[in-house]
Structure formats: structure tokens, C-alpha cells
């Protein structure tokens, strides 16, 4: 049997202003958040995943569809639960204005697709950062997903599941 889904959707629309800074930009991150509160970071979604499973254990999680639209370089996102990094995904690509990256971790359609303004669709799986967990899922309970996408617009859909039948 396939599970029933209830979709929770949230969006962040950010201004497309370019920010010019000085100083060194490091090409690595650490698996923790530097702020006292993860909600202080721009591009953070707080998610309450109320999925129900017949065998409800901590390893179960729900699929997610992430959409990133607009200009950004090497977009990536991280899922935190109780302050700990539990999943991450990212791509080595430069999104231009008019392009949209759609990444789905649904079992039936695990895809990473790039849409351009002319309607062309291409797979960007080969540009996925394979040092990350990839095709993130949201854990049961309260968690946060943090996007590092500069000024691009972001939306996330969490597919709550019910497979108790």
C-alpha cells in the first residue's frame, strides 16, 4: 500500500538585491548553527511533521520537495532537529534569473531538475554535492530547514504521511 499524503507548503520570497562584501569567503561549513537560535537565520523554515506510521520510530521521516528560483550560486540546504544536523543537500551549479531548481525526495519521483525560462527541463543529478546526505527528508516532530541560497526565492513542501493501514 502507498501512504496517504498531506502537503504542508511554505515559501520565502526575498529581494534580489546584490550584496557586496569584503573579506574571505570560506568554502566549507560546520554541522552546527552559529547563532543562539536557528530562527535568526534568513531562509529558515520551522516544520512540525505530524506523520503517523504503524511502526513509529526515530528513523522514519517524510519526503520533501524543494524549489529554488532565481539567481544564486551553489545552493544548499540543511535540516536540523534539536540543534543537530540530520540531513543536507546541495548542488554545484549557478542558477540564473529565470531558472528554477526543483528537488523531490518523493519515493515515486526522486528527481533533481532544472527548468529554464524557455520551458526546457534538464536533470542536474550529476551536479549534486555527493558529500551531503542528498534528497532530504524531514524527521517526525519539530525541526528546521535552513536554506543557503543568497537572494533566490525558495519554497518547500513537506509530505506528511499516514501508513497505518
Identify the meaning behind each predicted range:
Residues 1-9, 143:
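Oligomerization/assembly interface segments of phage tail-like spikes and tubes
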Residues 17-165:
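Intrinsically disordered, low-complexity segments enriched in serine, threonine, and glycine
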Residues 8-19:
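Short, charged, solvent-exposed linker or helix-capping segments at domain edges/interfaces
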Amino acid at each position: 500500500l502507498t501512504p496517504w499524503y498531506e502537503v504542508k507548503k511554505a515559501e520565502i520570497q526575498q529581494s534580489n538585491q546584490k550584496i557586496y562584501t569584503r573579506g574571505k569567503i570560506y568554502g566549507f561549513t560546520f554541522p552546527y548553527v552559529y547563532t543562539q537560535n536557528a530562527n535568526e537565520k534568513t531562509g529558515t523554515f520551522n516544520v512540525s511533521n505530524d506523520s503517523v506510521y504503524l511502526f513509529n520510530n526515530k528513523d522514519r521521516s517524510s519526503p520533501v520537495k524543494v524549489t529554488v528560483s532565481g539567481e544564486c550560486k551553489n545552493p544548499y540546504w540543511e535540516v536540523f532537529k534539536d540543534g543537530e544536523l540530520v540531513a543536507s543537500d546541495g548542488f554545484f551549479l549557478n542558477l540564473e534569473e529565470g531558472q528554477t531548481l526543483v528537488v523531490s525526495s518523493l519515493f515515486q519521483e526522486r528527481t533533481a531538475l532544472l527548468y529554464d525560462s524557455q520551458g526546457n527541463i534538464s536533470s542536474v543529478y550529476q551536479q549534486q554535492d555527493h558529500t551531503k546526505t542528498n534528497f532530504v527528508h524531514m524527521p517526525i516532530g519539530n525541526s528546521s530547514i535552513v536554506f543557503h541560497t543568497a537572494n533566490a526565492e525558495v519554497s518547500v513542501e513537506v509530505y506528511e504521511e499516514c501508513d497505518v493501514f
